[in-house]
Amino acid sequence: MDFSSCNNHYFYDVDMKEDFYRCIAPSEDIWKKFELVPGFPLSSGGCPGGGGTDWAAEMMDLGWESPVKLTGLSSVVLLRDCMWSGFSTRERLEKVIHERLSTGSPRVTNTQKPVADNETSEPGVDSIEQNATPLVVPTPIPEKVPNSSGSESTSDSEEDEIDVVTVEKRKSYGGRQPVTITVRADPTATKLFHISIHQQQHNYAARLPPEPNTMSPQHNFHSTVKEEPGEVTSPPELQPCSPQMPDSPLASGSSDSEDLAKRKNHNYLERKRRNDLRSRFLALREEVPSLSRSTKTPKVVVLSKATEFLKGLVIQEQQLTAEKLKLWSRHQQLLRRISQLKGR
């Protein structure tokens, strides 16, 4: 196989020598180089067993207008070459392909099924894709990914590596089950807890919790009497009743006398206010010329006539002040005239 033609078609611009997909160390963040480039889908048909150059020729005939359509073998090889810096030489790639084609044991085919269930292709292609699946598809446990990637260059047999990856996946699936059970159980418990708090805080129609029964003062008094029997000589019930019997008529008589005094004072003040108001209206009626001779006049009529008379007085006052100013000016003119006559 010759992958140089594929590399020329994969890069965007070879003339400008823009090395977007240079090989980097595994410790660096390689995903930054592939953020804007979509991944290549793995075809289900696979590539033919012996024609390694047919897929490269077909890929070159597509042109830049259509996206690159790669088979399962080519996509896996390119992804491993570009992403993980593996299979950088042609000899190592051919060696691996020949090993997979020659050693097609049933153990390898059995381990391929849990990893790639949906892919159906030839045995040689399946072996190469199975070799690349632990590198392209990350396992659920992140600690196991560097182990599978580092085992490519150090391990002697690739079949053991595939078995380890499948066992790790099964273990990870088995370990996820209790986690999902606990996660499903937590929200229900929290919801019930919040509902109970909400009902306790906002259920205003509910009855209050029963309060502790407070002891009556009579019961407390009996308890104190029982504790100190030597100090009490007479029954306590008769002491407050004996002075209240003779004092009850005196208290009622004093309250009645206070009410009578308040009523008398109120009546006196009310009569005084009415007499003062009547005398004021009579004086106002005497001041109004049109009502001075009438003996019985309603208060409303007295007020209306008084306001009219007051407005008339205001107008007369304004007229008199204007006339006064005119007379004062005339007086000043006469004084000047007298002074002029004396000067001659």
Swiss-Prot record:
InterPro entries membership: bHLH_dom, HLH_DNA-bd_sf, Myc_transcription_factors, Tscrpt_reg_Myc, Tscrpt_reg_Myc_N
Main location (coarse class): nucleus
Signal peptide: none
Tissue: High levels in oocytes, modest levels in kidney and low levels in spleen.
Localization annotation: Nucleus
Keyword DNA-binding: yes
UniProt-annotated stretches for the region Leucine-zipper: 313-341
Domain of life of the organism encoding this protein: Eukaryota
GO-annotated biological processes: regulation of transcription by RNA polymerase II
Region called Disordered, residue ranges: 104-162, 208-271
Biased composition (Polar residues): 104-113, 213-223
Keywords: DNA-binding, Nucleus, Phosphoprotein
Biased composition (Basic and acidic residues): 259-270
GO molecular function terms listed in the Swiss-Prot or TrEMBL record: DNA-binding transcription factor activity, RNA polymerase II-specific; protein dimerization activity; RNA polymerase II cis-regulatory region sequence-specific DNA binding
Domain bHLH span(s) in chain numbering: 261-313
Gene Ontology CC terms: nucleus
Assembly and binders: Efficient DNA binding requires dimerization with another bHLH protein. Binds DNA as a heterodimer with MAX.
Name of this protein: Protein L-Myc-1-B
Protein's organism: Xenopus laevis (African clawed frog)
